[in-house]
Amino acid sequence: QTCVSCVNFGNGFCGDNCGNSWACSGC
């Protein structure tokens, strides 16, 4: 499984597909 650098989940949060998430303004 490859981790993506950033996926915008909306609601001010981004993450990858490896279980990590963080607050963000956009990707």
UniProtKB/Swiss-Prot annotation:
The entry's keywords: Disulfide bond, Glycoprotein, Pyrrolidone carboxylic acid, Secreted, Toxin
Subcellular location: Secreted
PTMs per UniProt: O-glycosylated with 3-O-methyl-O-alpha-D-mannopyranosyl.
Source superkingdom: Eukaryota
The UniProt record lists the keyword Glycoprotein: yes
A Gene Ontology term for the protein's cellular component: extracellular region
Disulphide connectivity of cysteines: 3-18, 6-27, 14-24
Signal sequence extent: none
Gene Ontology MF annotations: toxin activity
Primary site of residence: secreted
Glycosylated sites: 2
Residue numbers of Pyrrolidone carboxylic acid PTMs: 1
The protein's name in its UniProt record: Cassiicolin
Organism: Corynespora cassiicola (Target leaf spot disease fungus)
